Amino acid sequence: YYQGFVMGLQCISRKGLAAREDLTQFAEQVRQFASQMGAGVAVANADAFMQVAEPMDELCVRVDQTIAIHLVSRESVSGREIKAALESLKFELDAGIFWYRDVHGKNLFNAVNLDSTPFIAAALDDQAYRGFSMLYDLTKVPAGEKTFNQFMDLVVKLSSHLGLDLVDDQLNELSTQWLKDIRSYVVERQDEMLSVDIEPGSELAERLFS
């Protein structure tokens, strides 16, 4: 049997910070449950909680960034070539997205269609594409330059193998300085996460940024 337990409400996610009304409703439900069980209950103070939660939510908004590098053909590239190049680097197609996983099977990086429509396995062999995008969700990968350098190594290999240009969201060709700035930006945002004991790529980060 149990002498007691804790009931919790996730108040911070990619949907934003829970409203005070949600906290009030949750507290009332907990009290009703405790009453039915003939148990005592201690509910956290909503004002004190919000004083902590609001700056935490602001930090999460600030660090919740996905870096996109687009690999674009000046004409077109066949789906067969894209698939072969990605699979040669251990990417696997799953639900319309090519995923790159670590040795434990955890998703690290992904490649998506340039127009955001899913890659369809049956159509890849016969379809031509303008290109694809490589995505780096800095909240979901281990912290540090090493992981970003691994990502960029894959990007450069794919670009070289397929003869594709590397461009940003405005289709401007990437410069060496841009890449240095992005690397620094990633490290700074991940350091912010670590400063509040949220390890990028951890179970807590997965839950917060869901």
Outline where the language-model segments fall.
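Intrinsically disordered, low-complexity linker/loop segments enriched in Gly/Pro
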Residues: 39-47
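A short mid-domain helix/strand-loop element embedded in enzyme catalytic domains
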Residues: 46-64
